[in-house]
Each structure stands twice: as structure tokens, then as C-alpha cells.
Swiss-Prot record:
Keywords of the record: Blood coagulation cascade activating toxin, Disulfide bond, Glycoprotein, Hemostasis impairing toxin, Hydrolase, Protease, Prothrombin activator, Secreted, Serine protease, Signal, Toxin
Domain of life: Eukaryota
Function: Serine protease. Activates thrombin by cleavage of prothrombin. Does not activate factor X. When injected into rats, causes thrombus formation, fibrinogen depletion, uncoagulable blood, decreased platelet count, inhibition of collagen-induced platelet aggregation, leukocyte infiltration in lungs, congestion and hemorrhage in renal glomeruli and necrosis in renal distal tubules.
Documented EC number(s): 3.4.21.-
Family statement: Belongs to the calycin superfamily. Lipocalin family.
Protein name listed in UniProt: Lopap
Tissue: Larval bristle.
Annotated GO biological process: lipid metabolic process; proteolysis; response to reactive oxygen species
Protein localization: Secreted
């Protein structure tokens, strides 16, 4: 489901997700995060695999400001159909950092989960991060997304992203990344509809 998988992945998990021994790593979100500067369209360049994925590609998300929060519309293309979810992205109370909460409507369900932005320049790239601890098994599930304002990262942004990933190589195994297809064929769709099937627990 590509970028659409971002919204499903952080809300549900099965064996295909990246699950690692130990607790979630101690990551730092972007300080003094500017919600208004983050608005607009982002394209998913690559990410860790998502268990909820089907055969979707051409993933993107649009953030629209609304009274201090960001409305969300995230979609992907699958079998010539654009499938999308809607929701809101809000800052957590008591912090100016990019420690965010994502709420997504799926059918009659509203799913809520953390989503941190751990690096961005607002104009070219962003790195989204989510982690869930499984205390009983002493493991954690990690999701990370490399995002761009365009369907390809420019060289400067690519260098910045690669530096971040190198600095966090213990937390993020780069061999786990899968890339998004933005070819004309992958992005072609005849109709669109909202995702309504419940998922997760």
C-alpha cells in the first residue's frame, strides 16, 4: 500500500512488519516543529515493509491546515483504483516538537497512533517514524518513511537522508527498505474510493 501503508502500518501489525528485539530506540523528534510549513503534499520514496500492504503504488499524502491541526488525505493506487483514508494529524500537548498523533477514520472505526517527524527541511524531504513496544515479548515494531515534496529526492536531500540513516544504522537496517513505484503505469487509476475495511486490533 506504499504511503497509504503509513496510516495502516502504525495502527496494526502482523508478522510481515519489521519487529526487533528490545524496546523502542530513544529517538528525538524535530524541535519547534512548524505545522503550517509541513502542510501540502508529500510523496513516499521508500519505507520499511508494511504487513497491511497489498499491491498498491504511487503513494502520497496531502495535509490541509484546519484550526491548529492538519487534515489528512492519504492514498495509493491499486488495480487502477485510488484508495484513500482521511483523518487528522495533531501535536501532542505540552511539546513544541514533532511528536504527533495521527487519527484515521476507517469505516466505523477511528484509529489513533503516534507519528514522529525525526528530520525535515519542510521544502524538500521529511522522515516519518513510528514505534510500538511489545513488552511481553521484549520486542518492538518499527516503521520509517522517507518522504519528498516531489516523486524523486534531489541529490542534496538524498545526502541528508543518507547521513541520518547512517547515524542511526543501529536503529534502522537499511536493507529493510522497499521503494515506491511512481511510474505512469503505477499511478494510473480510473476511479477512487475511501478505504472502509476495519483492520488491526
Amino acid at each position: 500500500m506504499k504511503f497509504f501503508g503509513l496510516f495502516l502500518a502504525i495502527l496494526a501489525s502482523t508478522a510481515a512488519d519489521v519487529v526487533i528485539d528490545g524496546a523502542c530506540p530513544d529517538m528525538k523528534a524535530v524541535s519547534k516543529f512548524d505545522m503550517n510549513a509541513y502542510q501540502g503534499t508529500w510523496y513516499e520514496i521508500k519505507k520499511f515493509p508494511v504487513a497491511n500492504e497489498a499491491n498498491g503504488d504511487c503513494g502520497s499524502v496531502e495535509y490541509t491546515p484546519d484550526n491548529g491541526l492538519l487534515k489528512v488525505r492519504a492514498g495509493h493506487v491499486e488495480d487502477d483504483i485510488e484508495k484513500f483514508v482521511v483523518g487528522v494529524l495533531t501535536k501532542n500537548a505540552g511539546t513544541s516538537d514533532a511528536e504527533l498523533t495521527l487519527s484515521v477514520v476507517v469505516g466505523d472505526y477511528v484509529r489513533v497512533a503516534p507519528l514522529w517527524i525525526v528530520s525535515t527541511d519542510y521544502d524538500n524531504y521529511a522522515i516519518g517514524y513510528s514505534c510500538k513496544d511489545y513488552k511481553k515479548s521484549n520486542q518492538h515494531r518499527v516503521n520509517i518513511w522517507i518522504l519528498s515534496r516531489t516523486k524523486t529526492l534531489n541529490e542534496s536531500s538524498k545526502s541528508t537522508v543518507n547521513k541520518f540513516l547512517k547515524e542511526h544504522s543501529k536503529e534502522f537496517d537499511q536493507s529493510k527498505f522497499v521503494e515506491t513505484d511512481f511510474s505512469e503505469k503505477a499511478c494510473f487509476f480510473k476511479k477512487s474510493h475511501v478505504y472502509t475495511v476495519p483492520f488491526g486490533a
